[in-house]
Amino acid sequence: MNVNLTHCSLVRNFDAKFRLHLAVCRLTWPMQRPWIGLLAAGALLAASRPPRNTQEAFDQAPTAAAVASSPIPRVERESPSDLELSGDLAGLAPGTIRYLTRDDLLTLPQVSYTVSDDANFTAPTQISGVLLEELNRRLAAAPESDMLVAICSDQYHANYPHAYVAEHHPLLVLKINGQSPAGWPKDPETHRDDMGPYLISHPKFSPAFKIFSQPDEAQIPWGVVRLEFRQEKMVLGAIAPRGPQAASELAQAGYRIAQQNCLRCHNLGQEGGMKAGHPWLVLSAWAAASPKYFADYVRNPQSRNPRAQMPGNPGYDDATIAALTAYFKTFSSSSQEQPGPQEKEKP
């Protein structure tokens, strides 16, 4: 029996995943096919074992062949539960819209966790679904530079820059306690609204930084209907501070806070959520014309408008408010006419 394994190799590729090269393995004895079958079965068994934790799920990320076998996004919506995709999708013109069904998403690698620190749940809860980094690798035109934006049915936005995804491993939830959305709990605020068709959670969230009294905050939207794959520099660059005070320490601190907090419900042009109904330049005008009004609005919106839906930030200290005020003021100039605090607010 002559065995030549000189061309049989385990190759470790650039993203730390092993691929077994069987096609170039020469086994020169009569039992060649059974050995190949055993090797292939072993590789399949190893690949099919579910990951035990987030890092293992990341290490089991798909090779090029696996990505090629990903479900093809559909041109038309087939069901209200389809996940809408847009932005910069691989192989498509920017802004193209496509859809993935729940069944499509369930064919992707699934991870499962029991979470105990998600404010959307009142008790430890089992969740399962697809990691956002998995979706980014498979669908984004430029996975290394794109960020994800989760858009909800009420125009709330949750933003996932590359650093956030790498640090916290957010998960697009497909099942809660083994149930599809029809069996999910209601929303945590009113206990009336459905939290489907999708929501986003984390295996465990530990803040990575703190700016004054604003910690790194978990982005846990529910009612997610759309994922956008966007160029991070373009999205965050749109709300970068402007003018001669842009580089000041306070303005830069306010910029980082606004990325995590304000951008979820307020917009500057096409960037940011539209749930609040108060665009960036309105906030800027308030900060410039009446810093006290602006501070009151940020800490306790209902003190200025009883119908306001925005949750308050009562824990913001004076330094945090000063940073946000300095940041938003960079968008105003004495020559611009902006609506002031006396303008009647939308609910």
Regions found by a protein language model. Name each.
Residues 255, 263, 267-297:
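Gly/Gly-Pro-rich "capping" loops immediately C-terminal to redox-active cysteine motifs
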